[in-house]
Amino acid sequence: AEKAVNAYNTLKDWGMQMLVGTVTSNPCTAVVEKTHEDNMFQLTPSGSAVESIKYDNAFRVCFSDPGQGTASAKYIGENKLASKVAVIYNSSDVYSSGIYAKFAEEAANQNFEIVSAEAFTADNKTDFSVQLSKAQGADADLVFLPIYYNEASLILAQAKAMGYAPKFFGCDGLDGILGVENFDASLAEGVMLLTPFAADAQDDATKNFVSAYEAAYGDTPNQFAADAYDAVYVVKEAIEKSGATPADGVSGICDKLKGVMTEITYDGLTGSAMSWAADGTVNKAPKAMEIKNGEYSLIQ
């Protein structure tokens, strides 16, 4: 978070007038304090914590943590994916704990039971044998992982080593697991996740973006890349709608942009007819994906 604030101050010194960023929740929550002080417009592509956009100058492209938790519980319940669910989450991370809290709340309305909920922390995120043993001992047929892909890759490997093979289900933080260095991608076969972007979608916008991204970077884009791409064009839409110009200055631009964010709609890679509430949250539908044959596949 400190590095993010330092980077913000550097960019401000260079003449930045609005901010697309930051990428994740903890840095975003720190930086939004600064953009609020400066009345600078901020649009985070993928900072999902509630606190990341707690001021009226800040908006986001991605789902909120509570939204992901609620949507995941509904999807698992409505599609009858499991009767007994275990959760492994990071209690030291606002992204993970925020999703888990709302998941547990919505689970009470669904036809499955949370039989195990075990936390880890940033200081202890390499050995998951205790959490997995408790899930296995409780006969969980699905393990919900509201965490990022690095830790998830370790969990999948350790589950395989102990002969535990439940369905694994995560959120947008799992998008990118196939690219983890030295990870056996076959371990992720059948993993499901709710995420706003599917690189194998067949609409022209997605196909064009994926081919251009692969040509530029030699890799398939994930939802972080797609959220950031959409963020740039959302800002463009807001600028055009508001008539803001560089001459308005940082505060003037911010006032104009936040005034129109609740009026614009945008068709992007991560959602159609996206719209924004005054609290900065986006309205769009999540997409369910499953990893098949080493690729992310959209569940139709």
Model-found features: residue ranges?
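Extracytosolic ligand-binding ectodomains
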Residues: 1-300
